[in-house]
Amino acid sequence: VVAAAILRIPLVIHESDAVPGKVNKFAGHFAKRIGVAFTGAASFFPEKKVALVGIPIRKRILGGNRDIARENLQIFGNLPIIGVIGGSQGAGRINDATLGVLKELTEHYEVVHQTGTANFHDVEQEATVILEFGHKERYHAFGFLDESGLRDFYEVSDLIISRASSSIFEIAAWGKPSILIPLQNAAQDHQRKNAYEYAAAGACIVIEEPNLSPHVLF
């Protein structure tokens, strides 16, 4: 902001959440144009400066092929597919809730689960015990999905369970129904507000983290 003022360069900012952080609230006073991802964020800035622009999506996670994606993820059945993702680092509460109903889920669905790299070993071990006499071939766990893996994940998933970060816009770009579980202690409570604004459009169901238990999911 200071550099733009000194050099007399027009300032453009982008707000990716439904509620702006302190920096963008401050910068908004000096910005010439302000792009927002959620309509709710517009009320925090001068109306004449604001444009609803969404969030840019990486092209490399779009445009998959379902047959190739199923092969890459080792999915060979014809059941509906639930995709579970907690961001690049995973989400412990979502992992625990998924494992809590994993036996029941895999009786009716294939489950593709990004656990987070740090959680992968523990989740995989617990899933192995849970599914010892179940449908272990229907559970597909990954510590981390790169861009091609994410493309396959979104391509095959019939329902997505996720946090409510910028991944909302990836889910929206694919047109997938979702269950969003906002991170409870996110800054400015932005994930919860993101989730409810998205839900107001009829695009998802929101489960708040304190209400999350295995059997709420199934």
Predicted feature descriptions by range:
Residues V2, R151, I168-K176, Y196:
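Short alpha-helical segment that forms part of, or immediately flanks, the ligand-binding pocket
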Residues A5-D67, I75:
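Active-site-proximal region of nucleotide-activated glycan assembly enzymes
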Residues I68, I75-L159, R192-Y196, A200, ...:
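Donor-nucleotide binding loops and adjacent catalytic segments primarily
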Residues R163-S166, P182-A186:
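Short Ser/Thr-rich beta->loop micro-motif in glycosyltransferases that lines
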